[in-house]
Amino acid sequence: MEEMEALVGVVPHSADCDLFKEPVRKRRRLHRDRQFQAFPSAEQSALKEYEKLECRTRRVLSNTYQKLIQSVFLDDSIPSGLKYLINRLLALIEKSPLEPVYVGFLGITGAGKSSLINALIRQAMFLPVSGESVCTSCIVQVSSGCCEQYEAKIHLLSDQEWKAELKDLTKLLHRAEQSGEEEADLWDRDDATEEAAQKLRMLYGHGAERRHYEELLRLKPRGRIPNSRTITLKAEEAGELSVKLDPYIRTRRRDWDGESAETQIWPLIKYVEVILPKSALIPEGVVLVDIPGTGDFNSKRDKMWKKTIDKCSVIWVISDIERVSGGKTHEDLLSESIKACQRGFCRDIALVVTKTDKLHLQEYLRERKMGNQAIQSQREAVLQRNEIIKLQRKRMLKEKLKRKLPADSKVLEASDLVYTVSAHEYWQRTILTEEESEIPKLREYIRKRILDKKRRLVTKYVTEAFGLLLLTDTLNTEESLLTEELNTGGLRQFVEEKMELLEKAIEQCFARMEQPLQTGVQVAMTSYRRILGSCLVRSRGNQGFHQTLKAVCLKNGVYASRTLARIDLNEALSQPIYDQIDPVFGGIFRDGKPTAPALMQHIDAFKHSLEERMAEVGVRSGWKQDGYKRSFLIQEISAILGGLESHILRRKRKIYKSVTSSIQNDLKPCYEEAAQITGKKACERMKDVIRRGVERQVAEGLFERAQERMWHQFRQLKHGITEKVKGSITTMLTLAAPQGVGLCKELADVRNEQKEMEKLYRSLREVAENAQLRRSMQDFLLRMSPSKAGPHGTKL
């Protein structure tokens, strides 16, 4: 009775589909009409049909849930099968209708990320644009929602998080009393030190950089800090919110007198969320993420920088036209985005070249040695150069991706790996048309991602719901679906045998890592001195590096800045291992061709073998006229094994990071020792401590331990998969067994819900066919429309 009351106490929330009252129904219809206004009419129709399918399914599940709860409300105990069904129903009812699609804008300061987002949402100057004296200071997430107003939430570091950073900042800024003049000059010119000093001056006033940690703790910050550590801003118009938001998300690169109270707290800002009203340009469910710089000195913000990159399913590496061909920071960000494909959720990478309208025609013609040939206008030259850049950078990007990812990775099949955009021309149209600015092309890509994701999620949702409604039939009878098979133990034995085969297949799949991992360790052992030297020795000597190195040591081998190149000694030392394992690792966790020897393919093979056996059992049990019994079992298998994918995605990040994390953990004592060094020749002494520490750890098995820790993570994943599959399949077979006398007469009559769910399930195909027909008609009309003139002959 107690567990029943606990279940009854949970009121299912039917997301956006509360269709039980007429006024609510009208509001929801209006909501849907506005929700899809970012899409062309053909896509709007498809999305509305999928939305209706999902809403009606959620309503059927809610009705079924309420009936089942009421039917057993007075029972002293709930049979395990019914408890399983009720919990599954509740989980499906409360499941989010659409997981956000995060699109990451990754680029250095001044690359044009904010300008690009402003153009995509068609709000000029909404986010602050980097200039000579200002830049975006934190991660900014922009999405559209159901709110009527423009809204922003500024999330601040907690008190403990700021105290931890404050302690490191003061350590970094502390100058030893006996430093010689040479060290003092170097200290004054250090970029890391200047950035740390700027943070303290901004928050506590001029002279704060000379105060000690305990003194600063007693000072009150100049800006107002709410107890909730969250600041909410609202406005009726975009421009109004932009003015309010501006001081929080943009910071001056140099000290500036007269900063506002809002600007004064930017060192405390963790990240900012901006929510637009329903947008006719960016669909609901899309989050555009401006990811500035290469990380942050604050550990919490730096972890968030990495995690934000990893949760993006799409990453656009932003580079302006004048920096697209080089620059260490740009190459580092490109490498970071490729790593996100390995360890994170990223499925698409593209290079977005910005500011393509910037071209001096006479210089361009002279460089191309074209004289007075075909190119006659600025527009033609810009379009030709765009095509050249696309060909060159696409080739470069593909080569990089092929070195790191399997040859059949989906990202390599993308039709557009490079975009050439101009936010300026999107607004002005003095040289290029709106289409030629390629802003609409980026919007179209986003829309297609959302439409495809919605289709897949709704199909999976309706199919899973149909399986649950079939389960009520199973629980409502004293007969077993698989009585003979279960009684003879045939099916259980079959599952156990297949489980053993799955376990061996997973072991063989992971064993492919053994050789490249071993080779990587050997290469790392022969190259670590050279790698460490390249990190510690600078062409200018120690000028401008003294306190930067101290910052590296304070953060256990990592220095990240909003404006400077990222330094990570641990990643550098582990890179030879990753160079060897990346293609194989990507192959194991790939989502490419179904014939590929990937981990999920072994799980799919296990699923298909069970489904085939269920079909055989169905034939022997006389299910030809009642395919629903077989459908229930097959769909339960799909639901059980389908849930493994998210588990594997979460675990693979930990596996991939394990090598670098292991090296960082083992080198932590030498970093801590080096961070304490002050006085004369401190920079060289810190380097010596780091070198000796690395030498000692390598001799004691630094890389071998990293190898073993990665293997440990692989073993944990294998164990987790097999245990989850065993437990879930056992539960499913138990549900297929007889439920016992008495249960059938206690359950509510949900036959109407079953019939409605059957109709919804059958309509999935019709909706998909309608969507395909609309797409074909739309493509036909586009092909028949007059084509735009392209650039004249492209020359490489």
UniProtKB/Swiss-Prot annotation:
GTP binds at G107, I108, T109, G110, A111, G112, K113, S114. Its main location: nucleus. Residues 158-185, 742-776 form a coiled coil. GO terms for biological process: DNA damage response; somatic hypermutation of immunoglobulin genes. SUPFAM superfamilies: P-loop containing nucleoside triphosphate hydrolases (SSF52540). The keyword S-adenosyl-L-methionine does not apply. It comes from the Eukaryota. One of its GO terms (cellular component) is nuclear speck. Disruption phenotype: B-cell and T-cell development is unaffected, and germinal centers form normally. Class-switch recombination in B-cells is not affected. B-cells in older mice (3 months onwards) show significantly increased somatic hypermutation near the immunoglobulin heavy chain locus, mainly at G:C base pairs. Other loci also show increased rates of somatic hypermutation. CDD domains: Ras_like_GTPase. Its EC number is 3.6.1.-. It is found in: Nucleus speckle. Keywords: Coiled coil, GTP-binding, Hydrolase, Nucleotide-binding, Nucleus. Nuclear GTPase found in germinal center B-cells, where it may inhibit function of the activation-induced cytidine deaminase AICDA. Reduces somatic hypermutation in B-cells which may enhance genome stability. PANTHER family: NUCLEAR GTPASE SLIP-GC (PTHR47308:SF1). This is Nuclear GTPase SLIP-GC. It comes from Mus musculus. The gene is Nuggc.
